[in-house]
Amino acid sequence: MDDAGESLKDPQFCATVQRADGLIIVAPEYNHSFPGLLKHVLDTNLTEYVHKAVGVCGVSAGPFGGARMIQSLVPVLRELGLVTIFWDVYFSNAGQLFDETGQITDPAYSRRVEKFLNELVWMARVLRYGRENLPT
């Protein structure tokens, strides 16, 4: 590609990522990995990711909640300069986990999501301070 993929970027998405201090990626497991479209999106926004916090949630209809997807994705995220938090959320048996309004029906999952979000916010704040105040 002559323009190093610049023509494939979505300007609105790039601007949103640039303004964000952290990202949440929710993706299904696809052939023991993450979907190709997610890889495409990640590869077309390289500079916007450096020193940003990211949390990952896996989704599956089965009992593992996208564990293999997360395991495949984390090294890619680190290579892009994103900082992964240590909490992941595995939405296993996703078809039974949410009610008709999209609310989580299992209180244990609600607690996991709360821990996940708290850790993501903490890491995003720390990294924002670093981006704004420390030399790279």
Where are these regions (language model features)?
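Pocket-edge positions in alpha/beta enzyme catalytic cores
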Residues: 2-5, 61, 105-108
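Glycine-rich phosphate/pyrophosphate-binding loop and the adjoining helix
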Residues: 83-136
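N-terminal beta-loop-helix "entrance" segment that forms/cooperates
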Residues: 1-8, 97-101
